[in-house]
Amino acid sequence: FETRERDDRRYGAGSRLTEDRDYFYHYDCEGNLVFKEFRTLDWAGVSVPLGGQKAHLEEELGITFRAFGAGWRYDWQSDGMLSRVIRPDGKEVSFAYDALGRRIRKSFAGTTTHFVWDGNIPLHEWTEEAEENVVTWLFEQDTFVPAAKLVANGECFSIVSDYLGTPMQAYDKQGDKVWEQELDIYGRQRKRPSAF
């Protein structure tokens, strides 16, 4: 909790988060988050369902909206893997997995990113736009903590992580900082990082 009174969020059956200061959370009968609904309309480009659309969406998801019916929609496969996210602006992000449950593809806005794994550690990622855009990730031995990023054009970056293994900074070959993020004590970004 972020307040002394512990009133900044509420939990429901199964200890599921049902609301916080920004969202109402809706779940399906299997406990999967299916909709994260804005409490207020502060997000630019939000698509708000009107009348019949809102009722149809409530029926389809098996939920009852508590505010405007605008927010993030999550669709799940029968095996519990996230298959699709529909953003508040209506744009869709879709995912595909291999037989071991590892994400092998993410598609958004006409770009598809592919992932290759070494056991449970991501090894390569690339987009379909060009062959020379392969990215190789190196991890600390026997951990999930990223240590470096190698790009096909010859760029390489060292990654500095915090004590939990969360990447906090990245440096190029010359030792110049090229990326940084800062988190508050709840893990939210204080300073939004640039793309890395």
Indicate residue ranges for each PLM-predicted region.
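Short, small/polar residue-rich loop motifs at catalytic or cofactor-binding pockets
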Residues: R4-E5, E19-R21, F68-A70, D89-K91, ...
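A residue-level detector for well-ordered beta-strand positions
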Residues: D8-R9, Y25, Y74, F95, ...
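Conserved Rossmann-like nucleotide-cofactor binding loop
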Residues: F1, R16, E30-N32, M81, ...
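Surface-exposed extracellular loop regions of Gram-negative outer-membrane beta-barrel proteins
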Residues: L33-F38, G45-S47, E60-A96
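A motif-centric feature for acidic-aromatic and gly/ser/thr-rich catalytic loops and repeats
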Residues: E2-G12, N153-F196
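Beta-strand-dense domains in secreted/periplasmic systems and polymorphic toxin scaffolds
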Residues: E2-E5, D20, K36-E37, T64-F65, ...
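Structured, non-catalytic alpha/beta "coupling" segments that mediate domain-domain communication
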Residues: F1-R16, D20, V116-L123, E128
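Short, acidic, Ser/Thr-enriched surface-loop or helix-capping motifs
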Residues: G12, D28, A44-L50, E58-E60, ...
